[in-house]
Amino acid sequence: MKAIILAGGHSVRFGKPKAFAEVNGETFYSRVIKTLESTNMFNEIIISTNAQLATQFKYPNVVIDDENHNDKGPLAGIYTIMKQHPEEELFFVVSVDTPMITGKAVSTLYQFLVSHLIENHLDVAAFKEDGRFIPTIAFYSPNALGAITKALHSDNYSFKNIYHELSTDYLDVRDVDAPSYWYKNINYQHDLDALIQKL
């Protein structure tokens, strides 16, 4: 099982690449890597990013998005890594701007997936908040690759586009025993300031 850290966004709203923003002296990407490593669930943790940022990561396992799908958002990152690892059975996807994700959240979602896998033949297990799914904290089966490829060849690169074609189930973020901010995206500097005040 592989983990994909999505870190290829332009971070326009934040003002600088979010992967290198810091919480308590630790970069977002380092923090997410450490959390994923702590679960002992993954045979490989891969950072998915763009050519401009790739050399800035102090981490050996960085993959640049497929050149045919540059600037097509997070689906391009998932697509690129799935194509490179056709034998892999499952991929966990997390956005780099979710620095407070916990190992407990990852393992809880995995247990949810496994418990529903056989009965429901799930392609995707994701979290949801107030009925809205969070596609960038989710497990994806390789079966999702077809729908992702189709979306990338259309003009609609949104996750909603692929979720309609896949067997998907959701776990509520409140089902995880963790601080309420564990799943929050940091989109703006004031989001980071607010998070730091809570810590």
Swiss-Prot record:
HAMAP family: MobA (MF_00316). The gene is mobA. Belongs to the MobA family. Its main location: cytoplasm. Transmembrane segments: none annotated. It is an enzyme of class 2 (transferase). Its EC number is 2.7.7.77. The keyword Nucleotide-binding applies. Pfam families: NTP_transf_3. One of its GO terms (molecular function) is GTP binding. It catalyses: Mo-molybdopterin + GTP + H(+) = Mo-molybdopterin guanine dinucleotide + diphosphate. GO terms for biological process: Mo-molybdopterin cofactor biosynthetic process. It comes from the Bacteria. GTP binds at residues 6-8, 18, 65, 97. GO terms for cellular component: cytoplasm. Its cofactor is Mg(2+). Transfers a GMP moiety from GTP to Mo-molybdopterin (Mo-MPT) cofactor (Moco or molybdenum cofactor) to form Mo-molybdopterin guanine dinucleotide (Mo-MGD) cofactor. This is Probable molybdenum cofactor guanylyltransferase. Keywords: Cytoplasm, GTP-binding, Magnesium, Metal-binding, Molybdenum cofactor biosynthesis, Nucleotide-binding, Transferase. It is found in: Cytoplasm. The lineage of its organism: Bacteria, Bacillati, Bacillota, Bacilli, Bacillales. It comes from Staphylococcus aureus (strain JH9). Disulfide bonds: none annotated. Mg(2+) binds at residue 97. The N-terminal domain determines nucleotide recognition and specific binding, while the C-terminal domain determines the specific binding to the target protein.
